[in-house]
Amino acid sequence: MNFIRQQNYGWAMALPLGLNYFTTSDLPPEKLLKQMWRDVYDCFDQALFDTYDAEMQSFLLHLGSFEQVTPAMAAAVTGMDTASATLLRLLDLGSYMIPDDEGGYVVQPFMHAYLMDVQRRKCSSEFIAEQFDRAANFWRGQGKLQRALEYYHRAGNTDQILILLREESRKKASAACFAELKGYYDLLPNETIQAYPELMSGMCMICSLR
């Protein structure tokens, strides 16, 4: 049962449902849990996603990868003028998300896992990467460097990571800031870092902190 507790995404029904699966099957725990979630997601499809109108389905497919979202970010990613109202519709449904302290919303872990599953089944990897790019562009415009870098990384967009790191190094950011950026410097090949003086400067700052 510890195996289920560790992978229940905070969903209260996972434990009793998992108990039923584990007592009626001889499959290994990993395969059994995978089958349980597949059955659960199929039920969610029938009871939730498949019943929504095309606008709501599109909205969820655009935002399925995000654990947190603000109305402004949702509008930037989806391109929908009705993004704020659609988020309120989701909030009224009661299961998808809860308000956070920043005026946005945190998606419930088990619903986030479900929406990512829907997105993977219905969308191309290029589409998913594009949504991360849009989110990164939004947070970049808001001056939120770490969030922008995180989403460019999840989009696999090393070109934009390179540009952002060069821009940040030119600002002569604090040593503490460079320490936070180390993981993104590590994504770049050594020859790329060596080709740009500002990146070499940033890397030297990072090395001095060790």
PLM feature spans:
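Residue-level detector of well-ordered alpha-helical segments, enriched
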Residues: 13-18, 55-59, 86, 131, ...
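C-terminal boundary/linker of central alpha/beta nucleotide-binding cores
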Residues: 8, 41-121, 130
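C-terminal helical "lid" of AAA+/P-loop NTPase domains
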Residues: 2-7, 13-27, 58-62, 72-77, ...
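Extended alpha-helical scaffolding segments used for macromolecular assembly and cargo binding
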Residues: 125-208
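Short, polar/flexible loop-turn hinges at active-site or ligand-entry regions and domain interfaces
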Residues: 27-30, 80, 120-125
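Conserved C-terminal helix/linker of AAA+ ATPases
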Residues: 22-44
